[in-house]
Design a protein with these regions (language model features):
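General helical structural elements
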Residues: 8-11, 74
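Hydrophobic small-molecule pocket/channel-lining residues, especially in calycin-type beta-barrels
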Residues: 26-171
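N-terminal secretory signal peptides that target proteins for export/translocation
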Residues: 1-7
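Generic signature of intrinsically disordered, low-complexity, basic-rich segments
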Residues: 5, 20-21, 103
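Short helix-onset patch at the extreme N-terminus, typifying the N->h transition
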Residues: 7-8, 36
Length: 171
């Protein structure tokens, strides 16, 4: 009788440990941290004259914050780096961008925590006209941690634009 009770207690203890480990391992949110370099051959830059993408993206992420530095070539051929800071609590945050634009963004995670989504609205003035760009960026890291894929779409007065950017972790 004592052996049966002991076996049941041991079984439920083991089951509880397995359940805890599996929910901890599978519940972990994607972490985008790393220095990433664009693989132009694997990327789809979209159509039109704005076929450009950051050549490098450097990301640091902790439990509450995502910091991102995107470096692109400017029109004059020199590097241009934009720095953005996002909160991971689902609340709106603001970043200042090109032409004194204001980018309001919210970060969310997919239900399986494998995709980080940044939903943004950027407002700015150009030649006296107020402009607005709405953007959704979905970031995923490959299982081996060496590839970052960014599916991005944006909408403005000039139409819709879609890109799939593939970055490889810099060695």
């Amino acid at each position: 009788m004592k052996t049966k009770v002991l076996k049941q207690a041991l079984f439920f203890t083991f089951l509880s440990i397995c359940l805890f480990v599996s929910t901890t391992a599978f519940g972990q949110k994607v972490n985008l941290s790393g220095n990433w370099k664009l693989n132009e051959g694997k990327s789809q830059l979209g159509e039109g004259r704005f076929r450009m993408a950051p050549a490098t993206v450097n990301i640091t992420q902790d439990e509450t914050t995502l910091n991102m530095e995107r470096t692109s070539k400017g029109q004059n051929g020199q590097d241009f780096t934009s720095k953005e800071k996002y909160t991971l609590d689902g609340k709106e945050c603001e970043n200042t961008g090109f032409m004194n634009s204001v980018k309001k963004s919210t970060v969310t995670f997919s239900s399986d925590n494998k995709t980080l989504t940044i939903t943004s609205t950027t407002t700015f003035e150009r030649e006296g006209n107020k402009m607005e760009i709405k953007q959704v960026e979905n970031f995923k890291v490959s299982d081996d941690g060496n590839t970052l894929t960014l599916d991005a779409s944006s909408t403005s007065q000039r139409g819709e634009r879609k890109q799939t950017l593939v970055y490889e972790k810099a060695k």
